[in-house]
Amino acid sequence: ARALSRIADPAALELLKKSLADEDAEVVAWSAYGLGYGCKGNEAATVRALVGRAATLSVTKIDRSGPLDWGASFADALGRCGNAEAEATLRAWLDIDDKSEAAALALGRMASRRKRLDDASIVALLDAASRPDKPVASALLAFTRIDAGSDMIKARLFNVANDALSDSAGARRSFAVRALGRVGDAAVPALSKVLREPSFTVTERSDAARELARIGEAGQVELRKSLAAFVPKPETRATLKGAELAPLRVVLDSLALPIRDAKPALDEIASIELPKGDPAFARRLIGLRCRAASLLAGEGITQPKLVACDPDPEGVAGRLALLEVLARGKLTGTRFTRFKELVESKAPLVRQAALEQLGSHPEVAEPESILAKALRAPDAGTVATAAQVIASYPDRAAERRTRTTATEAVDGSTPAPEPIKPHASIVDALTTAFTLQRAPDSTEVWTALTDAAGALQILSFKPKLDAFCKSPNPALRQHAEKALRVMGEQKRECKAEGPAPRPSELDHLVSDKVTLVFETDSGEVKLSLDPALAPVAVTRFVDLARSGFFEKVRVHRVVPGFVVQLGDPGGDGYGGAGKAPLACETSPISFDPLSVGVALAGRDTGSSQLFVTLAAFPHLDGDYALIGRAEPGWERIAQGDVVQRVRVLPP
């Protein structure tokens, strides 16, 4: 049932319907999970099968011992199907003690996917979240993913979430903080309290800053007021070597112009003295200095603190801050000259960030020349970024770009846009990009190039897209199908014509749990990988750790309060170990705080990047392979930290 649930094709789904009747709880759980994963297009029949089997399980004695909760698997499957009957069933389960928590989680995931819930479900979730005897901890999850709606619902959500702030740290309190931003101005005092009080966790305080930013101007007023409390004094500055960096960084990132009364605090932060002999700590402080300087500068690219924030003239933090400032105005004249330097930078992170600005700056001269050069870049991330820009803004790659604002025809109607004629340099660069040999785990580059070819409707690339359409990789097939339909084959359906290559890891699968100890710039952190969850992926990461792959690799992504991610030698998130992509060994097990997962750029695209969640994020459940659990301490890690050494236990 586990294997069938991960295949989830029509033949597998028929077998899963049969195994749903099994008497083994684990088989039933995997069967329900697989049916939910393959529910699209067959929602009504699948929901009926799930609801019927759940009803019989409720009155029969089935052994519930084991690693999986069949009730949670059924709820998750119904949430994935997401039709009216599924939602009504989950709503009813909120009133059943042994199903309420799973039902709330499933409704939260449904809200994340659909961006809405029925009014009856919203009321039922608020009822469940506010039960005086035993509130359902996950009932507020849905409100972290959708807007609250009417003023009456907002008022009730505020009362429920505000009450939850008095709980001890846990899922209910965490979801309450994230839900308060949907309430609006009335939530500002409560969020301010969370942000300022050290009794709340670093994750909750970081979330509070983000939710204040979501609220708008009232939230910005509070962020500006709060900033002064976060300015590190010389005697307490060392706390920024650890987790206390996160709330300050999120406050800075959440602030928007104009800065008004935040200027004195920003001046202090932009002027923090850098330590000598501690480059890792200095890097953290440079990031703070440059973000503060960017806010102080507004549109002024010669602002003294902006110029001085990064002592390395080629430093990434300083150049990214300059790019932020440049992007606030038109990229013409001197500003364009500086932009051109950044968009041709040898630092991939800087170059990619500059390329992304082309979409919002139609005034940039000759964008097709910039994009063509980027498509020929030596690093995969820059190639993929350029292709993604073309896919989203195909006129930037055209011989003659269409006007950004349509003019009315004589009869008052809006004329259809002119067909885009790709610039010859773009066609040449894409041709080269498509013909290069790339590492087996370069799926993200291939899908980006496919999207670009489709957006520009370059018919000469159809043979390449036809090949992708038959690929065993589902991400390649999905993007190829979309591109081919844009090119005129509206009914094209892509199907694999052969199996994926056999993973080499199958020849030496890890059989027992393994602990990885990462020695980083921010200290030692640990995680435990469990092959029972995802045997092939766990074996891959253990092999990489033993080979020394992770040593000297930077932590390329940190979202405070959300995730820490590493495993790309290039440091921009586009690279891997050069091995065949991993099939998604997903499961019904939840991403709780300190869960370890395989990073993806689409189904079956994992390679060597892993992430650690810093709080509960159930919307990840079932879409990412969960491969283990981490020990506390990962909240200390900062973006840019280097893994100096990795130990594997047992050796």
What are these regions (language model features)?
Residues A1-A3, D127-A128, G628-R629, E635-R636:
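Short, intrinsically disordered, charge-balanced linker/junction segments flanking boundaries
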Residues A1-D9, L15-K18, V28-G41, T60-N83, ...:
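Structural detector for internal amphipathic alpha-helices that build alpha-solenoid repeat scaffolds
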Residues D9-A21, K40-K61, N83-D95, R113-A129, ...:
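Amphipathic alpha-helical scaffolding segments comprising HEAT/armadillo-like alpha-solenoid repeats
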Residues E23, S168, K346, P378, ...:
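Single, functionally critical "micro-switch" positions that shape active/binding sites
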Residues A25, P348, A380, E631-W634:
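Alpha-helix N-cap/helix-start capping motif
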Residues T404, V410-D428, T432-P651:
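Cyclophilin-like peptidyl-prolyl cis-trans isomerases
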